[in-house]
Amino acid sequence: MAYTNMQAREQLLQSVAQAIDEIAFALASLGEAYEQLDEQSADRLEQELFKPVQAAYGRAQRTYNSFAGRHELPDRQFGPAPAGAPTQGVKGFLDSAVDGIARADGALATLQDSMLPVEVGDAELRAGLEEVRSLLGEVPAHARQFVRTLGR
């Protein structure tokens, strides 16, 4: 059976959607952690962790919908994800967020390694995926540092 460009584009969008869903989960987890922190720590979490993940989430959605629009495929509205039980505590929510980021980055890395973005010939998509991964890249290290200094 021949692999068509349309099938390749749809598969690519499925992979990007999977990553977006994981980023949404990370955002929800960070939001829950934020709610449990004092004002100073919450502000730090917002600057160091939430903002880069939120930027990656927005960029990933724009990348998805722009690609879909250029190739006459349906766009998608992504909604918030549940974060988990509040009994996890701040560290638990941060661990969950980092896990979600790792899954999103893994999905995007696998997609990039597959050469599918090159095969469909879309430079804007490749640039968008690269930017999302770049935005997420430092977050796990910042989260570890945040946990180490929490309460000090």
Report each predicted region and the residues it spans.
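Short, charge/polar-rich alpha-helical segments
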Residues: 90-98
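Coiled-coil heptad-register positions
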Residues: 31-34, 38-41, 45, 75, ...
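Preference for long, well-ordered alpha-helical segments
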Residues: 100-103, 107-152
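Short, solvent-exposed, charged loop/turn and helix-capping segments
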Residues: 66-91, 143-150
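Amphipathic, well-ordered alpha-helical segments in soluble domains
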Residues: 22, 26-29, 33, 63, ...
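Short, charged/polar, low-complexity loop and linker segments
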Residues: 3-7, 76-89, 113-125
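Conserved alpha-helical segments that form or flank metal/cofactor-binding pockets of metalloenzymes
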Residues: 51-73
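Leu/Val/Ala/Ile-rich N-terminal alpha-helices, chiefly Sec-type signal peptides and the beginnings
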Residues: 1-57
